[in-house]
Curated annotation (Swiss-Prot):
Binds 16S rRNA, required for the assembly of 30S particles and may also be responsible for determining the conformation of the 16S rRNA at the A site. The keyword Metal-binding applies. This is Small ribosomal subunit protein uS14B. It comes from Salinispora tropica (strain ATCC BAA-916 / DSM 44818 / JCM 13857 / NBRC 105044 / CNB-440). The gene is rpsZ. GO terms for cellular component: cytoplasm; small ribosomal subunit. Disulfide bonds: none annotated. GO terms for molecular function: rRNA binding; structural constituent of ribosome; zinc ion binding. Its cofactor is Zn(2+). The keyword Zinc-finger does not apply.
Length: 61
């Protein structure tokens, strides 16, 4: 889990726009965040397996 201070810091509007970065809305992870969902890859995988993300299914070919 991310530290609460870092989550609050990321939520604040930065002085310069290039300093802004995405964090997972569910766990606060700063890396591998998909903008479309606002979630990190770990949370997307967990939620997709439980069927909580409509339209997302496991790839099979």
């Amino acid at each position: 889990m991310a530290k609460k201070a870092l989550i609050l810091k990321a939520a604040a509007k930065p002085k310069f726009s290039v300093r802004a970065y995405t964090r997972c809305q569910r766990c606060g992870r700063p890396k591998a965040v998909y903008r479309k969902f606002g979630l990190c890859r770990v949370c997307i995988r967990e939620m997709a397996h439980r069927g909580e993300l409509p339209g997302v299914s496991k790839a099979s070919w």
